[in-house]
């Protein structure tokens, strides 16, 4: 079984979500059932993100290291891998190679 390479029958919010002075840029995709995902790119560097809802981050290309709030351990993720972040939390991300990602809100 292969992963889907596109999303069909969706709406895209035209205005970009721009964070950290342009180091992270994404667009919101709205599905027919009202659920949302963001598709984005994070440039190399170290950032700290906060979450409202739980998230599943799927790495499409690039490489990063992640440290979840309350942990001292860093984990490395690359293309084809994913990681989960709890809701109402924070995580550190160290982008080693420009990151292309899909974020699903759980």
UniProtKB/Swiss-Prot annotation:
GO cellular component: cytosol
Keyword Glycosyltransferase (UniProt): yes
Any coiled-coil regions, as ranges: none
Keywords: Glycosyltransferase, Transferase
Domain of life the protein comes from: Bacteria
Catalysis performed (reactions): a purine D-ribonucleoside + phosphate = a purine nucleobase + alpha-D-ribose 1-phosphate; adenosine + phosphate = alpha-D-ribose 1-phosphate + adenine; cytidine + phosphate = cytosine + alpha-D-ribose 1-phosphate; guanosine + phosphate = alpha-D-ribose 1-phosphate + guanine
GO MF annotation terms: guanosine phosphorylase activity; purine-nucleoside phosphorylase activity; thymidine phosphorylase activity; uridine phosphorylase activity
EC number assigned by the record: 2.4.2.1, 2.4.2.2
Family that this chain belongs to: Belongs to the nucleoside phosphorylase PpnP family.
Biological function: Catalyzes the phosphorolysis of diverse nucleosides, yielding D-ribose 1-phosphate and the respective free bases. Can use uridine, adenosine, guanosine, cytidine, thymidine, inosine and xanthosine as substrates. Also catalyzes the reverse reactions.
Name assigned to this protein: Pyrimidine/purine nucleoside phosphorylase
Species whose genome carries this gene: Paraburkholderia xenovorans (strain LB400)
Gene name tied to this protein: ppnP
């Amino acid at each position: 079984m292969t992963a889907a390479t596109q999303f069909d029958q969706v709406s895209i919010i035209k205005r970009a979500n721009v964070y950290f002075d342009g180091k992270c840029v994404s667009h919101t995709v709205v599905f027919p059932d009202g659920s949302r995902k963001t598709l984005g790119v994070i440039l190399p560097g170290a950032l700290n993100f906060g979450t409202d809802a739980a998230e599943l981050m799927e790495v499409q290309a690039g490489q990063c290291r992640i440290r979840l709030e309350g942990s001292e351990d860093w984990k490395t993720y690359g293309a084809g891998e994913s990681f989960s972040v709890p809701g109402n939390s924070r995580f550190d991300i160290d982008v080693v190679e420009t990151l292309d990602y899909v974020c699903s809100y759980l």
